[in-house]
């Protein structure tokens, strides 16, 4: 039986603007760190999300954060969230120690995670029901354009996983198909039900096991 999360710690990222995060970890020493990106409009106080993060933290150290303009984080939501996400991935080891790093996210946060899959030190990335709905309706919307620019790069060099519900908008499913056509190491898992169901068992434990296995293997390879 996996150890339950024994650490749940509010964290403030002392940037400009100041951002709120949550750090969770199991009782046993974690082998992998997960930086998790929330969906547009979501906060760390959401009950279903909190339960999901607790389940992930049975295996992993989890750093989840509220983008600027959401929840208790300062600033205004916009294209800068991509830079914030990249900074968190880059500076995490200096703040919390060195561990193999996996990035993940839900909804818009899923696309943020995939956009960071080629960042230095990232061992793998996953996206739960990735959605561009919160990035603006028009292709020229600043955040949507920033994500397009982030994806205009060579193929991702690490394993990626997209998990989505069977009952989802056709445009969102097609965006995933386009991503996978350019990502030779990408995998897709379609679950029964809706995208909202992906925060419920058995998916937190399933994704955590995947992240731990991939991250641990990358850490051993780096030794």
Tell me the role of every PLM-derived stretch:
Residues 1-26:
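N-terminal cap/lid segment of alpha/beta-hydrolase-fold proteins
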Residues 105-109, 113:
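Gly/Ala-rich beta-loop-alpha elbow adjacent to hydrolase catalytic centers
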Residues 135-181:
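The feature captures the conserved acid-bearing segment of alpha/beta-hydrolase catalytic domains
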Residues 76-95:
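Alpha/beta-hydrolase active-site loop
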Residues 56-72:
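Conserved alpha/beta-hydrolase
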Residues 194-204:
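Catalytic histidine-centered segment of alpha/beta-hydrolase-like enzymes
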Residues 127-135:
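Active-site nucleophile loop of the alpha/beta-hydrolase fold
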Residues 40-53:
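The serine-hydrolase catalytic nucleophile loop
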